[in-house]
Amino acid sequence: MTASRAKPDIMARLLDEAAAAANSGEVPVAAAVTNAEGAIIALARNRMRENGIALHHAEILAIEAAMTRLGQDRLDGFDLWVTLEPCTMCAGAIAHARIRRLYFGARDPKAGAVESGVRFFDSAACHHRPDIYGGLSERAAAEQLQAFFAERR
């Protein structure tokens, strides 16, 4: 399966996983690591509140789960899919993991670090830049986040 054919299925799966995060009180963000054929190797959602660890963003957990499952310390040739533009911490993890392609949904002008904010992958401090594809299922992902925060205000 090519990455382009897998996009709707993967993003739909991530939106479901992000909804599960919201149902447990977490910010609705989910991430998946896929192989070159588009098969999901690892799937994760935000678990910061659940685990009591501020570092447990979906991207970090998905990358760690994929590395553990594969017995590798890098993910060359693998892709990361996420419902929200990654923050600086997650962008750093993506670079260190050597992710091949990054696909994300909603843009995050406040805390995002890929196309917004510090634009981590464009900085001299970044030693690996994945191919970046933003805006996948952007409307659905943004609406999910907006609904979550509207309930808490």
Region spans (language model):
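Short, basic and Ser/Thr-rich N-terminal targeting/leader segments
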Residues: 25-29, 76
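Immediate flanking context of iron-sulfur cluster ligation sites
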Residues: 72-84
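Zinc-dependent deaminase
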Residues: 1-24, 86-153
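Short beta-strand scaffold segments in enzyme catalytic cores
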Residues: 29-38
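A short, polar/acidic, helix/strand-boundary loop motif
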Residues: 4, 48-49
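Short beta->alpha transition motifs characteristic of CBS
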Residues: 41-48
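A short, polar/charged loop-to-alpha-helix boundary motif
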Residues: 50-60
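Small-residue (primarily alanine) positions within well-ordered alpha-helices
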Residues: 14, 18-21, 31, 42, ...
